[in-house]
Amino acid sequence: MNKQVRNTTEIVRLAKLKSQKTREKVDKAISKFCIEGFAINFNSIAKERNVSKSWLYKEHDIRQRIESLRERQITSNVVSKPKKSSRSEEILIKTLKRRVMELEKENKKLQNQIQKLYGDLYNKE
């Protein structure tokens, strides 16, 4: 006597359609961020396309894509120091040698002052 027939196929179809549209929005956002050089992370993608971060984390393929792009950006942002030329190394060595000599002279001067003060103190007693 139950005349209600549940038709869930349409609900399932609409849910899949919504999910597909969301995927397309996220893919467009990721592509846009790659082209324009923006930081790619879950927060920025979620804000750009108005999707929840939990949905991004739940979808494994999208999650892996964002994580790999984020890692690639981090490694590309690490800037290696330019190698010093032999000329700049020579200048640095000369500067450091000069500084060492100045410090040695100052040290010698201070040691002489200490010896003099010890002598004065000893003669006082």
Curated annotation (Swiss-Prot):
One of its GO terms (biological process) is DNA recombination. It comes from the Bacteria. InterPro entries: TnpC-like (IPR046229). The keyword DNA-binding applies. Pfam families: DUF6262. Keywords: DNA recombination, DNA-binding, Transposable element, Transposition. GO terms for molecular function: DNA binding. This is Transposase C from transposon PsiTn554. It comes from Staphylococcus aureus. The lineage of its organism: Bacteria, Bacillati, Bacillota, Bacilli, Bacillales.
